[in-house]
Amino acid sequence: MKLAGLSREVEENLNKGSWIRKLFDEGARLKKEFGEDQVFDFSLGNPIVEPPEAFKRALIEEAEKGSHGYIQNQGLLAAREKVAQFLGSRFEADFSAERIVMTVGAGGALNVALKSIVNPGEEVIILAPYFAEYKLYIENYGGKAVSCPLTSRFEIDIEAVRQSITPQTKGLILNTPHNPTGTVLSQKNIDDLGALLKEIEEKSGQTIYVLFDEPYSQLIYDEELANPFQSYHRVILASSFSKDLGIAGERLGYIGLDSRMPDADLLINAFVYCNRTLGFVNAPVMMQRAVARMDDLRVDASAYKERRDLMVDILKEAGFEFEMPKGGFFVFPKSPIEDEVAFCVHAAQKYKLLIVPSSGFGMSGHFRLSFSVPIEQIKNSRDIFISLYKDFA
C-alpha cells in the first residue's frame, strides 16, 4: 500500500503493522458482530484491577482545588519526593527528588532516556523476545536496535550479550518481570550482567547504560524483584504507575537515578530538557498530585495471581508447554505447530480466541496471552483451549 506524503520509515512500519493492534481491532469487530461474551480476547495487557480507593479520593480532592496549569518540566516536587522514597525503600539505594523526572508513562520515560543518551548510529541491545515498541523507540533517535536472544528458560544469556556488544553499543534494555514471557530474572543473572558490563568498561572505557524497564515490578507472585542497582552503577530506571496503581490510561511514569550513577546531574538535566523538547512538557499534573498524597503506591496483586493460577492450570490441562509466569500478567506458551501465526489465525477464525503470535515480539514458535481479563472469561475458555490444542495434536 502506497501512502502519499508519509515518511518512508513511518510508511514501512504502518505496512508492517503490529500484531497486538491488529488483534485489538479484530477483537472489536468480532465483539460487535457476535457479542462480547462470544469473543475470548487475551491479546491486550490492560490492567483489570481498579485503582485503590485512596487514589480515587485523592484525585477527587485535588480536582476540587482546580489547579490545572503548567508545572516545572521535571515534575511536582511532592510527587518526586514520594517516588524517591518509594524507590529507596524497594531497592535499598539512595534516591532523591532531584534525581527523579516525572514522565508520560514508562514509554515516555524510555523515549526521554534514549533521546538523551543515543547518538545516530549507536546501538541498544534488546533481549528477545521483547516488547515490540523497544525497537521503534530506539529508531526514533537514529539508533540501531540489536536483538540478543534470551536462553530457552528466558534468562539473560551472558555470553550472547558479550557477543552482541560492539564499540557502538550505548545501552541495553532490561525488563523484569518480563513482557511477553512473565519470567522474573534472578539476582545472580543480573549480577552476572553487571559484572560483564563493568569488565567491558574497565578494559575499554566504554560507557554502556542499563535502561531498567520495570512497570510490572509490583506484580510478582513467586519470586522477589532483583535489584540491578546493587549489580551495576549505570542504571536508568524507567517505570510507571500503569500497573502499580491500575491507571494505564492516565500515562504517569518516571525516570530514577540512584546516587551511584556517574554524571547523574548532567543526565537529569538532559532528561528534563528532552521531556520538554519531545513535546511531553510535563507529566499529567492531576495524577502527580494524587500520587503525592498516597501512602502505598500499589494495587492488591492477589487478583492477578488468582487469574494466573487458573490460566496456567487450563493451559497445562490442554497440553501446552510454557515457562511458569512469576510476575506481570502474561503467559508465553509454545505453539503446537511451527507456524505460530497460522496457529493464532486458526484460533481467531475457529474459536474467536485472540492470542498474539511471538513473531510480534522478535522470535518464533510461541504465542502470548494476557490473563488480565475477567475471571469468568478464563473459566469459560477451558474447553476452547483444550479443543484448540487437539486440533494440532
From Swiss-Prot:
NCBIfam families: PRK06836.1
Source organism superkingdom: Bacteria
PANTHER family the record matches: ASPARTATE AMINOTRANSFERASE YHDR-RELATED (PTHR42691:SF1)
EC number: 2.6.1.1
UniProt record, GO biological process: biosynthetic process
Catalysed reaction, written as an equation: L-aspartate + 2-oxoglutarate = oxaloacetate + L-glutamate
Protein name from the UniProt record: Putative aspartate aminotransferase YhdR
Any single Pfam family the record assigns to this protein: Aminotran_1_2
Gene3D superfamilies, per database record: Type I PLP-dependent aspartate aminotransferase-like (Major domain)
Modification sites for N6-(pyridoxal phosphate)lysine: K243
Entry GO MF terms: L-aspartate:2-oxoglutarate aminotransferase activity; pyridoxal phosphate binding
UniProt subcellular location: Cytoplasm
Cofactor: pyridoxal 5'-phosphate
GO cellular component, one term: cytoplasm
Family: Belongs to the class-I pyridoxal-phosphate-dependent aminotransferase family.
Entry keywords, A to Z: Aminotransferase, Cytoplasm, Pyridoxal phosphate, Transferase
